[in-house]
Amino acid sequence: MKTTPGLRIFKPIIPHTPKPDSRIYVEDAWTMLKPAIRAIFLDEPQDFACSGLFNAVNKSWCEKSSGEALYKLILEECEIYISAAIQSLESQCDTDPSLFLSLLEKCWLDFRRKLQFLCSIAGGEGQTVGPHSVWDLGSELSPKHLFSAQKVRDKLLSIILQLIRDQRSFMSVDMTQLKNTTRPVMSVHMTQLNNLRGLFYGQSLYKSPFFKKPFIDCAVEFYSAEAMQFKEQSDIPLYLKRVEYVA
């Protein structure tokens, strides 16, 4: 009886190709991305190749370590420009509240527009590194530098507190304009404050770090003055009735 020889299976020898160091991806991406960031934020002519930049950056996003390194570089570079923009407003702190809010609003919306364009060419708007995305840059950088720019911060605070005082004094302040309206009230465009809410890192305005204590102090001052005025203008029974009603 003839036997069929066994089948031999040959496995091709595939040479091992070492995986490229992730730092190379970061270096390649940053070489292209850094001048692009500068051009975007300084409104310079944009002569970079968007497709090549997009591909280089996306290689860095593929690994956690390289993605974190690139995110840090982007954060530090963008911080230079948002810091300079907010600091430039310090010379405008003596202007009319309406004009000041217009300048601050323009600064914030301009930064968001440029950041959105950066995300579109770097593939970063939905790209997360840990819990963060490149889009979170605006939420991290803007309040940080607003709170550290004392003159700008205090000017904005005084405008908001004055609006609150006027409202509590039953003056014609339509606070609903904080929600997407455009009419000017008392020479201050309330829609600007609505646009500026992003400066508070998504927090309630009254819980934001720089606003909470001054707001409470303002409330105490206002109601103390109101109580004193009512006491001076009313007899004791009416005053006690008022206290009981407020309590």
From Swiss-Prot:
One of its GO terms (biological process) is ubiquitin-dependent protein catabolic process. Signal peptide: none annotated. SUPFAM superfamilies: Cullin repeat-like. This is Putative cullin-like protein 4. Disulfide bonds: none annotated. It comes from Arabidopsis thaliana (Mouse-ear cress). GO terms for molecular function: ubiquitin protein ligase binding. Belongs to the cullin family.
